[in-house]
Amino acid sequence: VGFKAGVKDYKLNYYTPDYETKDTDILAAFRVTPQPGVPPEEAGAAVAAESSTGTWTAVWTDGLTSLDRYKGRCYHIEPVAGEENQYIAYVAYPLDLFEEGSVTNMFTSIVGNVFGFKALRALRLEDLRIPPAYSKTFQGPPHGIQVERDKLNKYGRPLLGCTIKPKLGLSAKNYGRAVYECLRGGLDFTKDDENVNSQPFMRWRDRFLFCAEALYKAQAETGEIKGHYLNATAGTCEEMIKRAVFARELGVPIVMHDYLTGGFTANTSLAHYCRDNGLLLHIHRAMHAVIDRQKNHGIHFRVLAKALRMSGGDHIHAGTVVGKLEGERDITLGFVDLLRDDFVEKDRSRGIYFTQDWVSLPGVLPVASGGIHVWHMPALTEIFGDDSVLQFGGGTLGHPWGNAPGAVANRVALEACVRARNEGRDLAREGNEIIREAAKWSPELAAACEVWKAIKFEFPAMDTL
């Protein structure tokens, strides 16, 4: 019969160290911690098998297909330096295993099942190489960085934002007032907090109306294009699209979505709607730390970032390197480049395991947000460069004189940093001096400098190589 029942070692079929990877393969780098007594080759092969064609025992229907054509292969294993019993297992998946244009299906296949596997003590997906043959089946970001700049008519500097706080409990009218003050003071964007959806104290439609009013008023008074990220995240996809439609009817420039809690299917639907209707799409990564914070188990954020670029979003939160939230500098800049650039070289010192060629997929603006204030401005300008959104929530609304002066302080600080950089000054070394000079001409900035002169969030970064 050619069929032998029973349980076989995975490595007989799925560990293939002499395999030459194809240009069309999806490649994955897993950090594997095998259970005691399980050899690394067997653990790596088990991951390849369980995330592709394998199951725990030989089945006769294997004979009805070509395993060689469809199986995932563990083609290389290396020990992780400085860690006991941790290995990087490289797995190649044939392109045919995945549905075109579906991030949902890609994740269901690659990480859907293997993470509960008994032979592994822990498993983390560190990186994915998405071949152009697959990325070309995705629309990607609704607009991308250049189109966004053209829509907003803002060039040569990072964009400024502010999350409206307190995040929960304001009425729609008071919320709109805070939006107006921030935009009037000089910010480009204000933002719904990720958990502002449609609660009893502020229903979504009321918020959309008051925010649109605030936006148009600030626009008329400043002569600059303004935006407020209206959070369209909802309990059903239909309701989410309904909110996006209403935002479009109001004529506002941008909506927002929580892509991990909302889910990739909903996110991709919204991204398609946004491109078809000229809306920018801001993405918040609520829930990411549940998935990406543990060093030895889960999925690294650089994979979630790549997935978002495929699913679609024009902005995504990406850590600050300097504020209250997670992010080690080189690693953060690694996935910031993966979001913005067309082509990123493999660079293990930045956590990038594969060379990634995005071809013509539009880029995503990284958003730095969380515990940042005016004293951070030189560092942020230097680290993130022009193509970024810098968001100061408390760093705007916490200003002793109010929201609009808080916005003024941030705008003055940003313009000072950009100007100093363009004159060739070293922001890393002279940053504090640049802010102090600017504060002489701006009482709002001087007051902000005084309030936050001693604030530090000093904890070691968790996201290390």
Swiss-Prot record:
Q: Which reaction does it catalyse?
A: 2 (2R)-3-phosphoglycerate + 2 H(+) = D-ribulose 1,5-bisphosphate + CO2 + H2O; D-ribulose 1,5-bisphosphate + O2 = 2-phosphoglycolate + (2R)-3-phosphoglycerate + 2 H(+)
Cofactor stoichiometry and binding remark = Binds 1 Mg(2+) ion per subunit.
Site positions (Transition state stabilizer) are 324
Outline the subunit composition: Heterohexadecamer of 8 large chains and 8 small chains; disulfide-linked. The disulfide link is formed within the large subunit homodimers.
List residues modified as N6,N6,N6-trimethyllysine: 4
Q: Tell whether Lipid metabolism is among the UniProt keywords.
A: no
Record's subcellular location: Plastid, Chloroplast
What cellular component terms from Gene Ontology apply here? chloroplast
Q: What is its EC number?
A: 4.1.1.39
**UniProt: Mg(2+) binding residues:** 191, 193-194
Positions where N6-carboxylysine occurs in the chain: 191
- Which prosthetic group or cofactor does it need? Mg(2+)
**Descriptive protein name:** Ribulose bisphosphate carboxylase large chain
Q: Report the gene name.
A: rbcL
SUPFAM superfamilies for this protein: RuBisCo, C-terminal domain (SSF51649), RuBisCO, large subunit, small (N-terminal) domain (SSF54966)
Q: What UniProt keywords apply to this chain's record, in alphabetical order?
A: Calvin cycle, Carbon dioxide fixation, Chloroplast, Disulfide bond, Lyase, Magnesium, Metal-binding, Methylation, Monooxygenase, Oxidoreductase, Photorespiration, Photosynthesis, Plastid
